[in-house]
């Protein structure tokens, strides 16, 4: 990775961290703000969260083509402006139509930003540095969210709408800071993706080309299961289970969420050293087993009666184990998407995977809240245990479809170097033994 690429990457990650910092001010309080502070009711609050998800689902199918045609930089800037407008509008809105319109702008903007930033990171990294680049982004993102949430909690007053206007105003400014930061980035002229599949004709056939890539389709299926089993449960299913079955207080639930973030921040770079030279498919399979243990701990927390401290400890361990698994996935999944993508379809692949994530994030809370709300607690936890085990099975099956370089770039690079060295040695021996010097010189020239 060149010095210019490193400088560009640092700017991208700085902007992303500041944006996450602003996002942390509002994420924990959006439901309370709409339902209680603005007095619009639980129905409108639920519709607001639904609008955020639907807006993302609408724009993501078109985002990849825009990134591949126009480049990730202008797309990211458009996304930050939309998100900033939506966030500020959310803080100033006092009626249902304005809240929904602001949520649409906010959801669409955030959805556009994610694959654009991912593509910029791919352009500014190499296969050997990509895992560390995405791990650093994930670390900074969680650190920003955690610090922002902590400061936001000190500033918020649910009896004063003005305090929420400040929170959303800060978030809006941070989105604009992200846009201004990435606008100063000097991206490489072309993406540096090795071992890409043949690009074929595009852009009209971009989605068809992606669907023909069986490894990518398999990874998308795996991604849906992963996001459904973890992120898709944080906001609704697991939170409802924790309060209704484990019977922890909302304050203790906040501590559990903080433990999740702390686990990521503390373990990210330790985990990175352990996994970056391992087979990616095996790392994802291990995450499935870790999350299986996490859901078993959650199940046990609901069965411990008369020992609330033990139940609370089990629940917090669930969130900690989720955090460890997340820190293992950050240097694994996003780089694999990039390495599977043809050079001219990086944006399309990133957007497709973001779309899969959004689908899981939309369906996960819906199903989780429904099962817990109906009192089907055993069925809920059993389903998530099966999903977690499914991660392991799907990851191992995916590993059979990947090349050595895709599953482990370090091994792939080593094998290529050994092959080139062996070829060079063979050419040298052949040249030395040749009776005709001119012919041997031709062979060396061709080999070079």
Task: Explain the meaning of each model-derived region.
Residues 102-143:
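Cytoplasmic helix-loop-helix junction between adjacent transmembrane helices
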Residues 153, 173-194, 393-399:
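C-terminal membrane-cytosol helix-exit motif in multi-pass small-molecule transporters
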Residues 3-54, 217-257:
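Helix-loop boundary and gating motifs at the non-cytosolic
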Residues 39, 71, 92-97, 247, ...:
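Helix-breaking motifs and short loop linkers at transmembrane-helix boundaries and internal kinks
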Residues 1-9, 187-222, 412-424, 445:
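Juxtamembrane intracellular "pre-TM" segments in multi-pass secondary transporters
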């Amino acid at each position: 990775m060149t010095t210019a690429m490193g400088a560009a990457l640092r700017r991208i990650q700085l902007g992303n961290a500041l944006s996450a910092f602003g996002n942390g001010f509002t994420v924990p309080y959006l439901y309370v703000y709409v339902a209680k502070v603005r007095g619009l009711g639980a129905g409108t609050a639920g519709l607001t969260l639904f609008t955020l998800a639907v807006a993302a689902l609408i724009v993501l199918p078109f985002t990849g083509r825009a990134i591949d045609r126009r480049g990730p930089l202008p797309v990211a800037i458009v996304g930050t402006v939309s998100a900033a407008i939506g966030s500020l509008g959310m803080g100033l809105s006092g009626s249902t139509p304005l809240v929904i319109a602001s949520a649409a702008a906010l959801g669409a903007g955030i959805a556009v930003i994610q694959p654009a930033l991912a593509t910029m990171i791919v352009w500014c990294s190499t296969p050997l540095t990509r895992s560390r680049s995405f791990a650093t982004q994930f670390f900074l993102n969680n650190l920003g969210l955690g610090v922002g949430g902590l400061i936001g909690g000190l500033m918020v007053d649910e009896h004063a709408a003005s305090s929420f206007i400040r929170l959303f105003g800060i978030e809006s400014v941070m989105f604009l800071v992200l846009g201004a930061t990435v606008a100063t980035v000097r991206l490489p002229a072309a993406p540096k993706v090795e071992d890409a599949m043949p690009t074929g004709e595009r852009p009209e056939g971009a989605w068809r080309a992606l669907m023909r890539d069986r490894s990518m389709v398999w990874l998308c299926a795996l991604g849906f299961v992963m996001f459904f089993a973890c992120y898709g449960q944080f906001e609704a299913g697991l939170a409802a289970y924790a309060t209704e079955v484990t019977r922890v207080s909302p304050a203790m639930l906040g501590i559990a969420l903080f433990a999740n973030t702390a686990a990521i921040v503390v373990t990210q770079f330790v985990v990175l050293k352990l996994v970056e030279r391992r087979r990616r498919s095996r790392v994802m399979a291990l995450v499935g087993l870790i999350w299986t243990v996490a859901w078993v701990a959650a199940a046990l927390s609901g069965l411990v009666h008369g020992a609330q401290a033990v139940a609370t400890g089990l629940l917090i361990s669930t969130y900690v184990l989720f955090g460890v698994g997340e820190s293992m996935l950050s240097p694994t999944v996003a780089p694999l998407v990039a390495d599977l993508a043809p050079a001219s379809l990086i944006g399309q692949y990133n957007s497709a995977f973001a779309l899969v994530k959004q689908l899981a994030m939309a369906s996960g809370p819906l199903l989780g809240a429904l099962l817990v709300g109906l009192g089907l607690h055993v069925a809920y936890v059993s389903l998530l245990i099966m999903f977690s085990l499914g991660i392991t099975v799907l990851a191992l099956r995916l590993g059979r479809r990947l090349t050595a370089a895709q599953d482990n770039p370090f091994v792939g690079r080593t094998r290529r170097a050994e092959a080139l060295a062996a070829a060079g040695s063979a050419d040298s021996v052949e040249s030395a033994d040749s009776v005709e010097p001119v012919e041997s010189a031709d062979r060396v020239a061709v080999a070079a």
